[in-house]
Amino acid sequence: MASLGVNIDHIANVRQARRTVEPDPVPMALLAELGGADGITVHLREDRRHIQDRDVDLLRQTVRSRLNLEMAATEDMVLIALRVQPDMVTLVPERREEVTTEGGLDVSSQRVDLTSKISRLQDAGIPVSLFVDPERGQLEACRDCRARWVELHTGTYAEAKWTDQPSELARLTEATALARAMGLRVNAGHGLTYQNVEPVAAIEGMEELNIGHTIVARAVAVGLQQAVREMKALVQNPRRDPLFGSY
C-alpha cells in the first residue's frame, strides 16, 4: 500500500503572487497532516519562486509526519539541507525558465558530483532520493551513486493520451521492479491527479506518491483536509480500471 506525500508548493505560489504573508504553507501543512498526509514535500528552488527558506525552517519544527525537501544538487542547497535536517532530500533538475519540473534528473552524466553530494547528505543521516525518468540507464546510475531511493517521474504517463497510458504505466511498473531488484526503494510523482493516480498507486513495490497541484486545486472547492482525505483514499485503496487491464 502506497503512502501519500503532499506537496504544498502551490500554496506558496498563491502567497508569492502578491508577495504577501498568506496563505502560509506552514499551517497548511498541519491541515494536510490532519487530512491524512503521510509526509509533506516542498521544493526550495534556487530562485525562491514559491517556498522560502523561512518556510523550510518552520516546517522542520512543525511537521509531525515526514519532511521531504526537494532541491537542486548545488553546494548551497546541500548546506541548507545539512542545516535543516529534513527526513529526506529528493534531488531534482531545475531550470529557471521552467514553470515546473519538466523531466527527470540526468544522473548518468553527473555521477561523480552526485555521488559526492549524496554521500555527504547520507553520512549526516539524511536519506537521498533521485527524481528520474523510468529508464534502466538512469536507475543503474542511481544505484552506482549509492542513492537509497528513486522517485519515478510520472509526467509522461500523466500527460499521455488515454490510448498511450497503458504503455506508460507498463514503463513505470517495469522500472519499479527493476529499481527494487537493484536494492532501491521507489516513490513516484509529477502530474498525478484524482483521475489517473490509482493505476500508479497499485504498482507492486510503490512506496509513496508525491502529489501537489491537483490536491491544492481540489482544496479550493472542498478545503485542504477533505482534498487530502479524498486523495489518500484513492492511493490506499486503488480500484481496478478495465482500461489498464489487471495490475
UniProtKB/Swiss-Prot annotation:
Database matches in Pfam families: PdxJ (PF03740)
Subcellular location: Cytoplasm
Active site: H43 (proton acceptor), E70 (proton acceptor), H190 (proton donor)
Leader sequence segment: none
Listed GO biological process terms: pyridoxine biosynthetic process
Function: Catalyzes the complicated ring closure reaction between the two acyclic compounds 1-deoxy-D-xylulose-5-phosphate (DXP) and 3-amino-2-oxopropyl phosphate (1-amino-acetone-3-phosphate or AAP) to form pyridoxine 5'-phosphate (PNP) and inorganic phosphate.
Complex formation: Homooctamer; tetramer of dimers.
PANTHER family: PYRIDOXINE 5'-PHOSPHATE SYNTHASE
Protein name stated in the entry: Pyridoxine 5'-phosphate synthase
Gene this protein is translated from: pdxJ
